[in-house]
């Protein structure tokens, strides 16, 4: 059974261009909570997506939808998923673990902007790009309606930022 850390290290090892977002990013930034899905914003270029697909396959993650994972490479099909099905993520799931990988199909912050402000967090020698606390707050505050876990994340992120400002 693989863990979220193994998935992060595998994405790094395959030289995928990604930024960790969502609940895992909150945890890596200091928020205490449980989560089983890894939300990542990736560069939607064929070579990078192919690396992501290889990483998922290597960890025996399969698409949640009954379609070949290679469909993720088709920009027109991704757009159709967003328009016709209001799809926000493309999910890879495990048959032997509750963990999953969510590839964000749409995000209010561009990859380049997110990456520029990302914090590089060292996980077993792998420098993992993690969405900044400020960007996480921006996204969490934009969720309508906010879920209970989003409200808690907002409170904790604001407290962490206030603590950082006090300690300089």
Predicted regions and their residues:
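Compositionally biased terminal segments of proteins
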Residues: 1-168
């Amino acid at each position: 059974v693989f863990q979220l850390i193994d998935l992060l290290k595998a994405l790094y090892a395959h030289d995928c261009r990604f930024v960790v977002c969502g609940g895992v990013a909150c945890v890596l930034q200091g928020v205490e909570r449980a989560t089983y899905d890894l939300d990542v914003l990736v560069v939607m270029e064929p070579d990078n997506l192919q690396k992501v697909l290889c990483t998922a396959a290597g960890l025996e993650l399969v698409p949640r939808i009954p379609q070949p994972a290679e469909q993720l490479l088709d920009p027109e099909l991704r757009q159709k998923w967003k328009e016709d099905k209001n799809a926000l993520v493309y999910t890879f799931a495990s048959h032997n673990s509750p963990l999953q990988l969510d590839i964000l199909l749409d995000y209010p912050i561009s990859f380049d902007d997110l990456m520029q402000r990302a914090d590089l967090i060292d996980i077993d020698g792998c420098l993992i790009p993690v969405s900044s606390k400020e960007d996480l707050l921006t996204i969490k505050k934009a969720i309508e309606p906010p879920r209970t876990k989003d409200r808690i994340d907002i409170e904790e992120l604001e407290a962490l930022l206030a603590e950082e400002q006090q300690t300089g």
